[in-house]
Every structure is written in structure tokens, then in C-alpha cells.
């Protein structure tokens, strides 16, 4: 779990920093953090320039853009709803629509989630994660959960809860938190032990 936490420290995501490692036979086979994807695989990381300075590629990571594309898209949807319904574009109305669930949308972000990056790292390197164990600093979102299920990972161990996740609601036949069902479903369980921070 310490390695998952250490991986999370590399993230420059504007909303939260998450780290993941996948193990198989007690060895780490991949890692992932949430950040923007780079062409031909992997994520954007700072690069060493000819003058020795370390810099991020302009427009590579979200913080270099100066905005979060997911939050921007949420606001565009909210304003479109208000315009189409001919409702006043006021802070109270925006807040009410966000509370209705639009504020929980995650699919408009440029960032690859840490769980997805760890699975993609396995795919890029022709490593099977079937029967692997995923260690995550946060409970996976429902989008990541479906890919975890499909990948063949048998267990997910996490530190922090993620109340926005609908994974347990959407995948009642595929995910369990009951250890007695771990032979039939993917086990999602909280980390027990000395925490990494």
C-alpha cells in the first residue's frame, strides 16, 4: 500500500491524487496514478530540458492548461439546461443543478484514472493482471470498477472511501465486500494495517 501511496504523489490532477499498484504472486506488476495520457502510451511527466531545468510539456497536464476540463464541461451542461428551460442563470440555480448529480460526473476529464492506467500498463507490456490484487489509495469509481471486473483482477484493497462511486450499486453480481463470497465475486475491501502517511 505504501507503493500505491508513493505513486499518488506523482499526480498533478486538479481534483484528487490517487495511486494504484497491481500485484501478482506478491510482486508489483504495474502502477498507476491519475494524470493526463500521452500519445503512444503512458502519462505526461516533467522532462529535463537541455539547460538542465525540469519542465512540464505545455498543455500536457491539466494544471498547465489552468482549468479542469471536467469542471468546465459540467458548467457548460448546467448553463445549457438553464438556457433550454429558460431559467435564470443564478448561483442558487447552478448550485441546485450540481446537487442533482451533474457535479458528480467524471467522464469529461482528460485525466486517466489511476486504476485505468495500472490496467493499461499491464496491457502495454503484455502482462496479465488476471487473479492480481489491486492496491488503491481510494475506493474505485464505477467507471474504473467495470474495467477492474473485466480485467480479471480478483481483489481490490483501498484506503479512502469514495462516496460518489456507484460501483457497489451497479455491480451487485460482480463485486462483494463479504470475504465469504470472494470465490464468486471481485472482493473490494478496506486496507487494514499501518497506513502509509
Identify the residue ranges that each predicted region occupies.
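Zinc-dependent deaminase catalytic domain
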Residues: 1-197
Amino acid at each position: 500500500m505504501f507503493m500505491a501511496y508513493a505513486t499518488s504523489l506523482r499526480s498533478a490532477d486538479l481534483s484528487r491524487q490517487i495511486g494504484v499498484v497491481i500485484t501478482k504472486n506478491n510482486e508489483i506488476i504495474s502502477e498507476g496514478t491519475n494524470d493526463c495520457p500521452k500519445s503512444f502510451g503512458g502519462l505526461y511527466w516533467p522532462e529535463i530540458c537541455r539547460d538542465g531545468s525540469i519542465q512540464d510539456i505545455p498543455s500536457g497536464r491539466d494544471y498547465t492548461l489552468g482549468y479542469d476540463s471536467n469542471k468546465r464541461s459540467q458548467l457548460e451542461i448546467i448553463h445549457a439546461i438553464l438556457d433550454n428551460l429558460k431559467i435564470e442563470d443564478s448561483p442558487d440555480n447552478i448550485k441546485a443543478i450540481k446537487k442533482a448529480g451533474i457535479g458528480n460526473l467524471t467522464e469529461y476529464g482528460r485525466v486517466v484514472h489511476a486504476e485505468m492506467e495500472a490496467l493499461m500498463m499491464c496491457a502495454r507490456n503484455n502482462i496479465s493482471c488476471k487473479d492480481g490484487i489491486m492496491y488503491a489509495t481510494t475506493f474505485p469509481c464505477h467507471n474504473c470498477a467495470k474495467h477492474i471486473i473485466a480485467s480479471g483482477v480478483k481483489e481490490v484493497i483501498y484506503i479512502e472511501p469514495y462516496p460518489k462511486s456507484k460501483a457497489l450499486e451497479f455491480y451487485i453480481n460482480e463485486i462483494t465486500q463479504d470475504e465469504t463470497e470472494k470465490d464468486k465475486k471481485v472482493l473490494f475491501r478496506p486496507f487494514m494495517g499501518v497506513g502509509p502517511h
